[in-house]
Amino acid sequence: MKCQMQVSKLLNVLAVSIGLTFVYSTSAFAVDADAALSMARQNGCLKCHAVDKHKDGPAYRDVAAKYKDKDHAETVKKLINHITSGEKAKFPDGHEEEHKIIKVKDVAQQTNLIEWVLSLPGGKWPETD
């Protein structure tokens, strides 16, 4: 009987732990689209990018399409590095320029921006990439 109570308590603790893990893991990827778009505007991202059309930089939907089948965590890490390090951006005509570094230093806000871009329904990525 005592063993049965211990097993029951253990199962209850396990169930609560699994439930909390699910809640935190799903809320961790909740995207604030308004905040992301506002941040993109404030940091001048929309001078070179648009949600659904190519400018000097690719459309955000096309970026989402490019990384759709890639490892998500690695993609987020790579794209955060891209917007915070000034690494070279390649243009369709072949020239390269340093990518503008965003002003926002809060990793959560940077991640929200990237998660928003990746959440957009895909466009297409040019075959030349």
What spans do the regions from the language model cover?
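Protein kinase-like catalytic domain
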Residues: 49, 84, 118-121
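The canonical Cys-X-X-Cys-His
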Residues: 42-52, 113
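C-terminal segment of classical bacterial N-terminal signal peptides
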Residues: 13, 18-28
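Electrostatic cytochrome c docking/interface patches
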Residues: 26-40, 66-70
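Axial heme c-ligation environment in periplasmic c-type cytochrome domains
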Residues: 47, 56-67, 81-111, 129
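Short, low-complexity, Pro/Ser/Thr/Gly-rich segments in the mature regions of secreted, periplasmic
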Residues: 115, 119-129
